[in-house]
Amino acid sequence: ENRLDNLLIVLGDFGANYFFNARDRAFKERLAKFPLTYFVIRGNHEERPSVMLEKNPMSWSAFESTAVGGTIYFEDNYPYIMYAKDEGGDYCINGKTICVIPGAYSIDKEYRLRNGWSWFSGEQMTEIEKTNLLKNLAPHYDYIFSHTCPLSWEPQICDLFFDGIDESKVDKSMESFLDKVISKTTYGEYFFGHFHDDRDLENNAHMLFHKAVKLTK
């Protein structure tokens, strides 16, 4: 069976480019045991694929994929793990139009830095990337996939916020940007991750963590 017939879309914090050592390789080897192709949208706890290519030009590649209708990055030893481009944008899978929007702010940034854990300075989209994405938005998408969610949806998920975190000090520029996105386009369904729970929201929006959803062809 062709791996491309079984495409799993991952909404960020995949864990494949985090440690940069044998732990990452072991994880990727385990993924190889499943007859799947992974299409990974970057979260906030992993390196940008363009940085992986820049640092490892002999073992990483980028090309236009007909499977997802856009630019993808991959590690040559693991071609079944495809990473969406840093700046997000348009893709097309099985004839369905898709907008991909990566990145988010790490609310535990200071804790990670104090403890010597990985933190990625490029975790959020840059202002240039945001401007270009807004400028190139289509009028409608069948699906929008992002890591975090629009700020206006937070009242539906505020019970998931961590105790002890002062929300007034959390950088929510990505969430505010996503409000602009949904004000400038329409969509059939919206899927996001980041908040470590599975639930359906209003406006045909779905938060995913453990749950997998089969998309209609």
Task: Specify the residue positions occupied by each region the protein language model found.
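Core catalytic region of metal-dependent phosphoesterases/phosphodiesterases
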Residues: 1-93, 164, 174, 183
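Structural motif
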Residues: 7-11, 143-147, 191
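Active-site-proximal loop/helix segment associated with metal-binding centers of metalloenzymes
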Residues: 63-72, 94-173
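Short catalytic/ligand-binding loop motif for oxyanion handling, primarily in non-cytosolic enzymes
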Residues: 17-19, 47-51, 91-93, 106-110, ...
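Conserved beta-sheet core of the metallophosphoesterase superfamily
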Residues: 29, 37-41, 46-47, 56-69, ...
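Adenosine-cofactor binding site in Rossmann-like domains, unifying the SAM/SAH pocket
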Residues: 89, 120-125, 211-212
